[in-house]
């Protein structure tokens, strides 16, 4: 390898009259010698600038030498520089080998896995309340009706079994009441005989219980003395052997006396006294139920806080047994009323299941209130521009059915009803939802042609 100084290199370019070089590449080592033993660092900055200019010069000189080599070779003039070897273009890289993929084989049988559906478990349980007493229990009823016992929401049998399906009681009155025509037509022959009325409800219409309303005791009606009114209760107890519910007239002053007398007359039969409310002498009614071994109905007006308060009074002040309390949060049957009733009952049931011991009692519904809505019993709409309502003979019972079905989904355990068709339909629905009816529609696509 030949060494030459920068001055020698410039003289060489002048020798061949090279004023500008382009496309020339110069390769080699650059040596810089410093004279003396010490280096002035302040000289490094201009040295760096000079080297930068020299590097730029070398770039252009390299291009010029390449031009000279090509020109000398064409003219046959020898040059002191060896020609730079031309590098052969790199061979293309061989394609990477792709690993072989095994053929996807579809299994003849899918992997079996057991599906475990999620189950909602609640810490609480609804109290079980038995209505009626058989001979073994000191009464004369042929059977008893048990309410409550749920550990899940209504008909959520996939979460927990529903030990007792909702029961249905049919209303009976101790005097001829004002009834919608669609209801009255089924009881016309027994309206003046409460005992026969009760027998018809059980034998013909399949009532689980009978609710006897002693409305004749109302001071604004017959003002029947309590001692006289309870004779009707005795007749009904003889006529039917199902559990009995006894109600008054709704008079705040008279009802405690009437229900107290009824509790005494029906001692041992475990009837339900309907009802104790915050605006009447609830303590007297509850004490009568406790003394004679009966159940008390705790009634409030769509207020969960009042329901908790009344239940707490019955438990703490009267020391009522927990298996002797049933709640009635009130049933409304139209528009917002039904919405409020459902929401209130649902809140009560969920609170009970979550462990609220002031609310974990069975729920009763006065479903007969459905007939209080004019849409259930009027011949047609009073508004001229309104569309026809349809025959009230069908509309009325459907109204009662919808009311009962809606509230059953909120958790109601006991329904007090009137129309026999509504009773039959709800019984069928409860048995179906509760898994008591086996089988189903052979061809679900033909459901529209089924006869009911």
UniProtKB/Swiss-Prot annotation:
Domain of life of the source: Archaea
Residues annotated as transmembrane: none
Gene Ontology BP terms: one-carbon metabolic process
Pfam families named in the record: CdhD
Covalent S-S links between cysteines: none
Role according to the record: Part of a complex that catalyzes the reversible cleavage of acetyl-CoA, allowing autotrophic growth from CO(2). Probably maintains the overall quaternary structure of the ACDS complex.
Family label: Belongs to the CdhD family.
Subunit structure: Heterodimer of delta and gamma chains. The ACDS complex is made up of alpha, epsilon, beta, gamma and delta chains with a probable stoichiometry of (alpha(2)epsilon(2))(4)-beta(8)-(gamma(1)delta(1))(8).
NCBIfam families with a match to the protein in the record: cdhD, PRK04452.1-1, PRK04452.1-2
Protein name from the UniProt record: Acetyl-CoA decarbonylase/synthase complex subunit delta
UniProt source species: Archaeoglobus fulgidus (strain ATCC 49558 / DSM 4304 / JCM 9628 / NBRC 100126 / VC-16)
